[in-house]
């Protein structure tokens, strides 16, 4: 019955997916969580940064696990598990005693990272199957909601820190987010279902159907996963400290907060517009342009002062989020639709590697400039990986 309704109204899949994703943009909004989490749970700045890095790493691993579940049991099952994990992370963080800050990684970072991972690829692959001829549109709408989530969560957490009704402080924010996310994600997950097999066939040229094992044996997989890894430092090295960085470079706290809000707007715009552009000019050309822009913006960000910090950061979030949003369509172009969920998950492992390796390298360098150097080097390496990328010619055996 639900599949028949969706067949007549496929926009319901996009609407359900977008409603869920508006609540899952934790990485984009982490800057507003960082300071209150440090104060409430007794974490150092480095410890809170690692909590963020572990969340991103769990997202990458969860994309593989959620992808397997989505491909075997369908998007609804994967999304329901994602809902349970994400809401469990919110509620566990609210329960966690302040003296047990070491447990924040286990209570929040891992389940929330896994939960968002189970939700994101299940929604993206489901939407692409319903809109097989317009994959950029499908990923753009869902990705745009992820970008807007950063702005929503930033404003929500700031309101909670000021206090409204029973919602007081960061614990109140975690309680309220869990209570809000649970019904929205349950309702949205119930709508998700794959289309009939015939509807999934793209109207274009790609007839490949690579299993995960076959995909892993291609050069294209390693180039794509490498590009995903190299896209991370431009934003993920700075998002946990963007408020502090803005104030160090001449902004007051209110003005520095705009870096998160406008960064979220940039993220939403990148996720919405660039996948649709890639439908017209191609995924490779789109990614090359985004990596080139990321390299230029990373260089400008190094020297930025005052409001230019906000401008450069918003541009970087546009590029980073656009690269992430084009990835699902690039994956199905290269490797086919039938295993889209798990294949995307394996590509997202590049994000896990980057989210852990680059912060570790930056701390090892022990220089603020090290972050900027790594961001520029990552953008250049990502450009080189995409430049070398070519279509898969045949199924590897």
Descriptions of predicted regions:
Residues 30-37, 213-276:
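Extracytoplasmic gate region of multi-pass secondary transporters
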Residues 62-75, 271-282, 366:
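Helix-to-loop junctions at the C-terminal end of transmembrane segments
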Residues 84-98, 293-305:
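C-terminal ends and interior cores of transmembrane alpha-helices
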Residues 101-118, 229, 308-322:
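Hydrophobic core of transmembrane alpha-helices in multi-pass small-molecule transporters
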Residues 141, 150, 334-367:
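A late C-terminal transmembrane helix in Major Facilitator Superfamily
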Residues 145-194:
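Helix-loop-helix hairpin linking two adjacent transmembrane segments in secondary transporters
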